[in-house]
């Protein structure tokens, strides 16, 4: 009997909701990236997008150390000469906490042809609410040591 090789339509996708309140940003990103890729499933294959949908709520309450809020920089470039913009993570957390969490999760995903397809299954919201109640998302608990 030949070895089973999963195909694109073989997997059923679930919806998970992760509450980011007091969760360390890196641990949140690893857990979300593993769910998005489907590494928790026995039918995981790196060449097939078999992952689940992930909703992250309360992105504004994620745990980041004060030193990183002050010193860690996020860079963006406009494309023009001298167009490099540097902002601290603290400044970005005040304006767009969902983008900080999304950038951390996307950074943990592979950089290949499937990456955009995997990224499209990620939804990040700064507040406690989300518009995906019709999909009946299952709460996903991140196990961590108390800080």
Curated annotation (Swiss-Prot):
<dbReference type="GO" id="GO:0003729">
    <property type="term" value="F:mRNA binding"/>
</dbReference>
<comment type="subunit">
    <text>Part of the 50S ribosomal subunit.</text>
</comment>
<dbReference type="GO" id="GO:0017148">
    <property type="term" value="P:negative regulation of translation"/>
</dbReference>
<dbReference type="InterPro" id="IPR005822">
    <property type="entry name" value="Ribosomal_uL13"/>
</dbReference>
<keyword id="KW-0689">Ribosomal protein</keyword>
<keyword id="KW-0687">Ribonucleoprotein</keyword>
<dbReference type="GO" id="GO:0003735">
    <property type="term" value="F:structural constituent of ribosome"/>
</dbReference>
<protein>
    <recommendedName>
        <fullName>Large ribosomal subunit protein uL13</fullName>
    </recommendedName>
</protein>
<dbReference type="InterPro" id="IPR036899">
    <property type="entry name" value="Ribosomal_uL13_sf"/>
</dbReference>
<dbReference type="InterPro" id="IPR005823">
    <property type="entry name" value="Ribosomal_uL13_bac-type"/>
</dbReference>
<comment type="function">
    <text>This protein is one of the early assembly proteins of the 50S ribosomal subunit, although it is not seen to bind rRNA by itself. It is important during the early stages of 50S assembly.</text>
</comment>
<dbReference type="InterPro" id="IPR023563">
    <property type="entry name" value="Ribosomal_uL13_CS"/>
</dbReference>
<dbReference type="Pfam" id="PF00572">
    <property type="entry name" value="Ribosomal_L13"/>
</dbReference>
<dbReference type="GO" id="GO:0006412">
    <property type="term" value="P:translation"/>
</dbReference>
<comment type="similarity">
    <text>Belongs to the universal ribosomal protein uL13 family.</text>
</comment>
<dbReference type="GO" id="GO:0022625">
    <property type="term" value="C:cytosolic large ribosomal subunit"/>
</dbReference>
